[in-house]
Structure formats: C-alpha cells, structure tokens
Amino acid sequence: MKVLGIRFCKVAKAEDAEKLAAMLGENGLGLTPNDMGPGDGFNGAVFPVDETAKDGQGSWVELWPAGENMPEMTMLQIVVDDADAWAERAKNNGVDIKGPDDAHGERIYYLDGPGGLPIAMLSKAK
C-alpha cells in the first residue's frame, strides 16, 4: 500500500479562486497550470507539481469557482495505489469512511477529518 500523491482542492467565490490561481501562476509563484481549454471567465485551474500528475496519480493544486452544485470548501485528497485496501484498513481501525464512488476514472472514498476537514482517498478505478 502506497501513497502516490497529495492534492489540495479549494472551491471558493469565483473572484477569490481566480486571484488565488493568479498568485500561484506564472506571474506569481511561477507554477504552470494545465490548459483548461477555452471558456468564458474563470473556469478553474489545476497546477500539477510533479511529472506523475499528468497521469492523474501525482500531486497538484486545484482551484474551482463555487457554484450551484459545487459549494465553497477546502478538501485534502490522498491519491493511493488501491483505495479499496486503504478504505478497508481505515474501517478496521474504526474510521468512519463513506463510499466508494466511481467518478472520472477514479475509485473514491470520503471521510471527515477532525475539525470537519473533508478528505477523499482515491485511486484509479479498476
């Protein structure tokens, strides 16, 4: 069982998310975002921080504008080699874990950390 990456996800008011993306981007801290394609206004930003992120397994920062189906929040996402095995371990250790959900080619489990921090544990879907 191995951790493959850590993702930081922030959903905020569109203006705040865009300003944070600008600060992290090439004219701020110098991170290079993925190309999100054309769109009207700010649609989000993903900043990979290692080469494996391009394969969907590494670490990155993702920023999204809040909307009707995406409320403001901060989430820690832990990318693992086998989400089912990690979830089983967590359950055996008494952690209240929800899931799995399969979305975007990933197997995802959810838990609430102390203080209410949403945490997702995920791997590529089998």
What are these regions (language model features)?
Residues 1-22, 27, 73-76, 125-126:
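N-terminal beta-strand motif that seeds the catalytic metal site of vicinal oxygen chelate
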Residues 4-7, 32, 98:
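A short, local hydrophobic-aromatic micro-motif
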Residues 25-33, 93-96:
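Conserved acetyl-CoA-binding loop of GNAT-fold acetyltransferases
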Residues 8, 36-38, 102-103:
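Proline- and acidic/polar-enriched loop/turn elements at helix boundaries
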Residues 13-18, 75-118:
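Vicinal oxygen chelate
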Residues 29-71, 118-125:
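Conserved short beta-strand elements that form part of the metal-binding/catalytic scaffold
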